[in-house]
Amino acid sequence: MMYCVKTFDSLYEELLDRAQNRPEGSGTVAALDKGVHHIGKKVIEEAGEVWIAAEYQSDEELAEEISQLMYWTQVMMVARGIKPEDVYKNL
């Protein structure tokens, strides 16, 4: 299977670019326009799905849920102006 490898930083840059350039039809732009309350609900939803996948689903399904949680976490970062280095200093 061929796939594009993204890093935490490259995903952040991609989302930041979408926020700044606002491509038509972008789900990221739509989520940012709805605000942190909407984004926060998605973070919570995906966190729950990670837990359920860890308990009851395959490793592949778990990895997919983790990727969705990372996406929504980074959308929240963009919405709030938090940069990856702000997160890294707390790891």
Curated annotation (Swiss-Prot):
A Gene Ontology biological process term: L-histidine biosynthetic process
Pfam families: PRA-PH
A GO CC term assigned to this protein in UniProt: cytoplasm
Catalytic activity: 1-(5-phospho-beta-D-ribosyl)-ATP + H2O = 1-(5-phospho-beta-D-ribosyl)-5'-AMP + diphosphate + H(+)
Pathway annotation: Amino-acid biosynthesis; L-histidine biosynthesis; L-histidine from 5-phospho-alpha-D-ribose 1-diphosphate: step 2/9
Broad enzyme group: hydrolase
Cellular location(s): Cytoplasm
CDD domains tied to this protein: NTP-PPase_HisE
GO molecular function: ATP binding; phosphoribosyl-ATP diphosphatase activity
Main location: cytoplasm
Keyword set, alphabetical order: Amino-acid biosynthesis, ATP-binding, Cytoplasm, Histidine biosynthesis, Hydrolase, Nucleotide-binding
Listed EC numbers: 3.6.1.31
Similarity section: Belongs to the PRA-PH family.
Protein name as catalogued: Phosphoribosyl-ATP pyrophosphatase
Source organism (scientific name): Corynebacterium efficiens (strain DSM 44549 / YS-314 / AJ 12310 / JCM 11189 / NBRC 100395)
Lineage: Bacteria, Bacillati, Actinomycetota, Actinomycetes, Mycobacteriales
Gene (UniProt): hisE
